[in-house]
Amino acid sequence: MRAMVQVAREPAWVVGGAVRDRALGRPTDDYDVAVQGDARHLARALARSAGAHAFPLSEAFGVWRVVDRERRWQVDVLPIIGGSIEQDLGGRDFTVNAMAEPLGGEGAYVDPFGGLADLRERRLRMVSAGAFVEDPLRTLRLARLACELGFSVDETTMAAARAGAAALAQVAPERIFAELKRIVIADRALDGLALMDAVGATDVVLPELSRMRGVEQSLYHHLDVYEHTRSVLAEVIALERSPGEWLGEYAEAVSRFLAEPLANELTRGQALRFGALLHDAAKPQTRRVTPEGRVTFIGHDAAGAELAAGVLTRLRASERLREHVAALARHHLRLGFMVHEVPLERRSIYRYLSACEPVQVDVTLLSVADRLATRGRGSEEAIRRHLELARVLLGEALAWRDERPRPPLRGDELARAVGLRPGRELGRILAELEEASFAGEISSRDQAIALARELVSPD
């Protein structure tokens, strides 16, 4: 900001979220600056002065972005709309975002709509009756700001958001996903999702979630599918915050793991939240009741993987995130089925890790959250057994991730030893050797070759 003050030739103001966050004492690295003149000149001058990069963000609106080369901060420079800063602020979404501070901080806040008073009351209020008509995305932004800031929403604004929610269908999917991500990864994500429900936004942007409402489950569940899904998300968030409560010696390793970047500017922990939201997405369409009255959801894991991928495709998420969340849905039942096989053979552990690769750790954590959120009949003993197995598999998954098991010889060596050409048969035998090695059944090259010769198909 000091650099911008030095290069500004025309009146300019810091506006929007940066002013709000400064008033709240919150750190920010994202600034909007409204200039009464040429935004391009100010952006380029700032870039030269700060050793940053400037480029046009919207040529139609004359908006330029300046980004620090190390991506520590960014500034969007935009021309004032209307004849004055007050008129410009009148086109903004909420009063807490409709404040301006003269560049350099000399002079009073420009606050024509009572944003400071709303900050003190921790309240979100629209600037004008047309706020949601001008940009329907503001309905989602309302939920996002409410959960990020912990603010309430005044009744008139809630009513206007509810009236405008259907128009979210007209908003570009990329913009919807940008807001939805911030809601899902917020500390108060459940509050944000509840507000989305209250204004009708969920029905438009995540109808798969809405369809879970009222879908009753078996006696082993104490909640319908929708409330169970919210509870699984709550357990995932709790695991992020305090992994030691359930994961014991693996807590530190899990914390590091969840902090790793994955895709779409999400960490693995944040992507796991999307897995929690979508892992049971296919339950409404797979629900059946047997003649004995038992509720089943056969195939909801495979169908859910397809549905989860479809949701994220619609939102224009990256291929990596789509595949990741789909894999979580596909494999989230595996651990639960294995509880009945305890004590596990090494081959069973190998097959679990191999089948779930590369989401072994992620899906094990999702399974823990899923089990903790299932507290129907006989749940206490079931949870104890599930967590006991989960800790075993989590340790194995973390070790696998550090060093994937390998057979005692390479593929080319095996091909020469048993006289096979590269192809499907050789790949099958290598996989068998890897499993046998993991199980401790072979450890030397000679043992591997002997087993391979037994495994070669006679034809």
Which residues does each predicted region cover?
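Catalytic cores of the polymerase beta-like nucleotidyltransferase superfamily
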Residues: 1-459
